[in-house]
A protein has these predicted regions:
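N-terminal glycine-rich phosphate/pyrophosphate-binding loop and immediately adjacent elements
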Residues: 2-139, 144, 149-160, 313, ...
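Aromatic-residue-lined binding/catalytic grooves and analogous aromatic/hydrophobic interfacial grooves
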Residues: 25, 35, 224, 229-230, ...
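Glycine-rich loop(s) and the adjacent beta-strand/alpha-helix scaffold that form part
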Residues: 33, 37, 42-63, 244, ...
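Short, glycine/acidic-rich hinge or "gate" loops at secondary-structure transitions
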Residues: 49-51, 169-181, 486-495, 567-571
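Conserved redox-cofactor binding core of oxidoreductases
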Residues: 64-110, 115-116, 124-130, 135, ...
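FAD cofactor-binding and catalytic pocket of flavoenzymes
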Residues: 91-120, 124-125, 130, 143, ...
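A glycine-rich dinucleotide-binding beta-alpha-beta segment and adjacent secondary-structure elements
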Residues: 210-218, 232-238, 268, 273-280, ...
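A conserved FAD-binding loop/helix module that cradles the flavin
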Residues: 540-558
Length: 571
């Protein structure tokens, strides 16, 4: 490849941020606010806030009643649609086509992506839960993998800092293992969900049911919620993009704030091939980029580089950044780069019906799913299991669902005008341990259309996850039974790493450069001007949705970098 570095001065910035999603947007905003000239590189197409073509369409406005034809799925979304609920007419424009961006897998691996400005921050589930020292101390206490190089006290103020800007609605519960945050008023449980809460907490005092905590503005505070934000309309169409800015995304929040500083340059359709490494200084000096439309090759330069291209994207870039100093990928002295792939495993849960409270209903379509049940196994000695370590949590809710069996006519009209009985559903999310042999690699023989090595995945669940899943399903069944629900059904289906869309851990943090890629400040051990603050850095997965942790760690890393540069560090 012949990368064009002519006009280097015009292509030099204080910082380069790779990726425009949850963590990339936050990195760019924090850097720009501190006065740094920032180049943000996004491999996908340009999208601006408000450019959400299906946001205000109803199901009957969408082609094929929101379904995607089987032929189209078979031709373009054969891996993306292995999550059978995922690819629809209202969101397929956010989803990559497998025939254009394929990958190999030694075990089934579900890599769900969106190539566009804003990334998956447009499509995310928005649940925001803090990690705790139960998570940060877990590897050390269990004697597996490596110890996190931080504790909750190190990140606690950054959770607070980020939550105020993001806008997280929720209810304080006082749980040490699921710390409370800076919450906006919650979307309260509806009457049937509250019945479930009361019944379960009476039968199982160690279990807590709380409204799901999500990044939706139940109260818009202009002094805090900068960008193009507005109060959540409770439409529950967030995955299409929200023209009101009711939920947090890079497009509605961090990118507009960064742009307002005058310090941001955003380039879409810019695929980062690799980082440029200078043997003389032992620092990264910039990035090599391929234009997604013209395939032109060029270089950009900076003092620092933030890798926020997603766990898989950033790890692939680092693995492909080979030099005499780093023949196996930039910063890969430990040999851990690409290993320890984690996700949350699901595909387990339950359904039921509830024939009480038929005289009650609810208003709006709250976008938080309903309730969250935080982990209650292996919290302390009283909840210790001997057959597996770690735990699981649940997300679910109750709603009145009308199932119409009447023929077309007056009976049909009456039936669809009346609410049906309450239907319960809940999904269990389990922790996946950081196994060294769960990994991603670069192909030695195949490249994509841009000449970049194709990715190969080899990751799966093991015995601990199998035992955990069985208990998660059994616990859900006993909770449904305690609530007096009828027609109980549980499931524990085969699943794959990646299916929860929380992939993480392939450039983990640690205390020792011999066993980890990053230090406690998200710096590559051997290349301290390269920071990785997307999910790659995770040392264990916990059971909580991870995005708020990515943002908190990103803000913390930028603050550290800024202070180091201002004291003329050798960063």
């Amino acid at each position: 490849m012949n990368f064009n570095s002519q006009g280097q001065a015009e292509r030099t910035y204080d910082a380069i941020v790779i990726g425009s999603g949850i963590s990339g947007g936050y990195a760019a905003m924090e850097l720009c606010k501190k006065g740094y000239k920032v180049l943000m590189l996004e491999r996908g197409r340009m999208v601006k806030h408000g450019e959400y073509p299906t946001a205000n369409l109803d199901t009957w406005d969408l082609e094929f009643q929101n379904k995607v034809p089987r032929e189209e799925i078979a031709n373009h979304y054969y891996k993306q649609n292995r999550l059978s609920w995922w690819v629809n007419q209202d969101n397929k424009h956010w989803i990559v086509k497998d025939d254009e961006f394929d990958y190999d897998e030694k075990q089934r691996f579900d890599w769900i992506r969106g190539h566009h400005v804003g990334g998956r921050s447009i499509m995310w589930g928005r649940h925001c839960y803090r990690l705790s020292d139960l998570d940060f101390e877990a590897n050390m206490k269990d004697g597996i993998a490596v110890d996190w190089p931080i504790r909750y006290a190190d990140i606690e103020p950054w959770y607070t800092y980020v939550e105020k800007f993001v806008g997280v609605q929720g209810k304080r519960e006082g749980l040490a293992h699921l710390p409370d945050g800076e919450f906006l008023p919650p979307f309260d449980l509806n009457c049937a969900e509250d019945h479930f809460k009361q019944a379960v907490e009476k039968a199982f005092p160690e279990r807590t049911i709380t409204p799901g905590r999500t990044a939706n503005l139940t109260k818009y505070i202009p002094e805090l919620h900068h960008g193009t934000r507005g109060q959540c309309q409770a439409r529950d169409r967030c995955w299409r993009g929200c023209p009101y800015g009711g939920y947090f995304s890079s497009l509605s929040s961090t990118i507009p704030v960064a742009n307002d500083t005058g310090n941001l340059t955003l380039m879409a359709n810019s695929i980062v091939h690799s980082l440029i490494f200078d043997d003389a200084t032992q620092r990264a000096t910039g990035v090599r980029v391929i234009d997604a439309e013209t395939k032109e090759e060029r270089e950009y330069f900076s003092t620092v580089v933030f890798c926020n291209a997603s766990t898989i994207g950033s790890t692939a870039i680092l693995l492909n950044s080979k030099s005499e100093r780093f023949p196996e990928g930039l910063g890969n002295d430990s040999g851990e780069l690409g290993h320890n792939m984690m996700d949350h495993h699901y595909g387990m849960g339950g359904f039921a019906s509830f024939d009480g409270m038929l005289d009650k209903y609810y208003s709006g379509r709250k976008p938080n799913g309903g309730f969250y049940i935080p982990r209650f196994r292996n919290i302390d000695e009283a909840t210790r299991r001997t057959d597996y370590i770690r735990g699981f949590g649940y997300q679910g809710g109750l709603a009145r669902v009308t199932n119409v069996n009447a023929p077309i006519g007056p009976g049909f009209k009456e039936a669809i005008s009346s609410p049906g009985e309450w239907q319960f559903n809940a999904t269990c999310f389990g922790e996946l341990l950081p196994y060294h042999d769960n990994k991603m690699m670069l192909s030695d023989t195949e490249t994509d259309q841009y000449g970049i090595p194709k990715l190969v995945f080899d990751a799966g669940l093991k015995e601990n996850e199998t035992k955990l899943r069985a208990d998660g399903v059994a616990c859900l069944e006993e909770m449904m039974d305690a609530a007096g629900f009828k027609n109980l059904k549980t499931y524990n289906n085969p699943t794959a790493v990646g299916a929860a869309i929380h992939e993480m851990g392939t450039a983990r943090m640690g205390r020792d450069p011999k066993t980890s890629v990053l230090n406690q400040w998200n710096q590559v051990h051997a290349v301290p001007n390269v920071f990785v603050t997307d999910g790659s850095f995770m040392t264990s997965s916990g059971t909580q949705n991870p995005s708020i942790t990515y943002m908190a760690m990103t803000a913390r890393a930028v603050d550290y970098m800024d202070k180091e540069l201002k004291r003329e560090s050798t960063i």
